[in-house]
Amino acid sequence: MIIDIGNSRAKVVVMDGDTLVKEYAAEEFSASLFAEIMEAYPAISRAIIASTRGDEEVVKSIVAQRIDRVIIFKPAT
């Protein structure tokens, strides 16, 4: 799972190796969006979070409830 939090919207991509499986887009990344994705793809075990907003720790707190392996890219990265 790749989560890209931009200035105007959040995009989430589900990958299987090098293959893009599904794309999601919303104004905000939320616990309900994450739950929807995890319900559809319960085998997801890794996530990358990138944010230009500086809210990556909030997103991580949602994601870390179900996924242990999380990499974060912050605005300064």
Regions found by a protein language model. Give the residues of each.
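Glycine/small-residue-rich loop that forms an oxyanion/phosphate-binding "nest" at active or ligand-binding sites
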Residues: 61-77
